[in-house]
Each structure stands twice: as structure tokens, then as C-alpha cells.
């Protein structure tokens, strides 16, 4: 049974056993574009990927299922070489405040593509992690500070979004996955915490 057949079964909930780890060649393969109309499997896959992210951010479900928290997942991480990503960034609010929306960014993206980006680069101050990497890799992961991304939803409708800050980093990390790139490829090997002119450090 193929990975997509197993994962899209009605009763299946994606867990850490479904996520392949670094060293698997699928993570180094440029994934194939999906064609529209999508197959039922491709639609269900996107929904299950989003469901996994919601479970991973729910303390009760995460503990019950043994999940690491995640804000993004790409189909290649499930050993499915298709250009499908899911991103789920919670709204961080000050103590005592009530968020307007639970999530700052919530999207299942088919064939996402960066169509323009800022000259300025940015990196998370605490570095990045990955559900497919079971080790800490310290260093600044240098990315674009701002990006414009085109993608299609499950109905084949095209969307264009402009992203900055943390949301921009998350989407770039997932788009890297569909291009066979790992986050640590973007860390300066000789000097992991090198700060070049104009690099924006996001705390």
C-alpha cells in the first residue's frame, strides 16, 4: 500500500510514525506539481495534514498521540512527493487579551510558489526545527524577510498572499520541503550565527 493510500484511509490519523526523517531520499527530491481537478486522495491528504497540525498544537491530543508540536507540514515529509503544504500559525496574544482569530495563518496550499521577495533577509533568533529532524541544529537559517506566494486551494482557486515575519519563515520552510531543501542547508556552515549586513533577526 502506498503512503498516500494508507494516510488517506478514513480512520487514519497522521502521527510521528508517518513522518519520514532526514536521510530518506524523498526529502531531497523536487516534488511533483498536482493537477486540477484534484483527486479525492489529494484533497483528503491536505485535510489530514491540517488535522495533524491542530492535534500537534492541542496539549491533550499531542500527549495522547505522542506528537511534536508543528506549525507546518509538507507532503514529502509523509513520503508523498507532491507539492502540497499545510501551515497553521497560532495567534500569539498578550496575557489577558482575547484573540480575534485562533490562527494568524491557516492554509492548505497546493503548488505554492514564491513569486517575489524582499531584498532584506531574516532569520529566527532561536533557529529552526523540523519534524523530520530529530536533532538540534543551531544557527541562523537565512531566509527572505518578506515573500509573496501564489498557491491554489482544493477547488483550484488561485490565491496570492503577502507574508512577513514568522509567517513568512514558516511558509518558506515548507516550500523548501517540496523543493528537496532542508532548513540546515541555509545555515552558514563555517559560522552558523554569522550576521551579514541587513539581516533581520526575528525574536
Swiss-Prot record:
Cofactor: binding details: Binds 1 Fe(2+) ion.
InterPro entries: Peptide_deformylase, Peptide_deformylase_sf
Gene3D superfamilies reported in the protein's UniProt record: Peptide deformylase (3.90.45.10)
Transmembrane regions listed in the UniProt entry: none
Keyword terms, alphabetized: Hydrolase, Iron, Metal-binding, Protein biosynthesis
Catalysis performed (reactions): N-terminal N-formyl-L-methionyl-[peptide] + H2O = N-terminal L-methionyl-[peptide] + formate
Active site: 174
Any coiled-coil regions, as ranges: none
Enzyme class: hydrolase
Binding site for Fe cation: 130, 173, 177
UniProt keyword Iron present: yes
Cofactor section: Fe(2+)
NCBIfam families: pept_deformyl
Function: Removes the formyl group from the N-terminal Met of newly synthesized proteins. Requires at least a dipeptide for an efficient rate of reaction. N-terminal L-methionine is a prerequisite for activity but the enzyme has broad specificity at other positions.
Protein family per UniProt: Belongs to the polypeptide deformylase family.
Protein name (database record): Peptide deformylase
Organism per entry: Streptococcus pneumoniae (strain ATCC BAA-255 / R6)
Protein encoded by which gene: def
